[in-house]
Amino acid sequence: GWLDTYHTFSFAGYYDPRRIHFGALRVLNDDTVAPGEGFGTHPHDNMEIVSIALEGALRHGDSMGNMQELRPGEIQVMSAGTGITHSEMNASDTEPVKFLQIWVLTDAENHTPRYNQIRLAPAKRNELRTIVAPEGRGGENTGWLHQDAWFSTLDLDKGHDVEYRMHTPGNGAYVFVIEGLAEVDGEVLGRRDGMGVWDTDGFGIRA
């Protein structure tokens, strides 16, 4: 088919009552879309949606009049709020597009819909980089959400480690390995593995 997708949490035809959400994190989909294909126009409401391009170009169009292409080094953040329709298509007729689609439960219903596309600040190896933060808490090159949720990326050299600290006491963190191996809080994770961590103020990540 035109779509190769892996779901961390229950979504569409995949349902596991033990894997509905992790805190406010509701969806984490790892999608590969064939050339010239994609998700036609469909509705959303009352959800915060983040797309992170990994490879290729994703063409976004929505009922607010936005039409943009998302490429590696960029993210798009959308608040569905009172309701929007949008489409996501592979912008290439020859190459696949790979991206992560992440849904976060909103802090309140019926926000005004909005869309932002952000060019991320250059990543520094072996340092955490915040790419999404709550409204008013991020910098120039970060997206924001209607939720107490933070997204960070990390590119670690083998043998290096960092300590991740929770931004809010009582929050948990979900770690997803895009490539390579990582040891997270003593557990070894491989490519595309994920793990939730909670009941702690922080934890170590080691390559």
Report each predicted region and the residues it spans.
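A short glycine-rich, His/Asp/Glu-containing loop-to-beta-strand
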Residues: 1-43, 47-49, 97-99, 106, ...
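Short acidic (Asp/Glu) patches
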Residues: 32-37, 54-66, 70-74, 79-92
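Short histidine-centered beta-strand/loop micro-motifs
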Residues: 37-44, 61-62, 87-91, 142-144, ...
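Ligand-binding loop in jelly-roll beta-barrel domains
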Residues: 63-67, 80-110, 190, 198-207
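A non-catalytic, helix-rich entry segment at domain boundaries
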Residues: 110-116
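Short, polar/charged, low-complexity connector loops/linkers at domain or secondary-structure junctions
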Residues: 130-139, 144, 183-184, 188-204
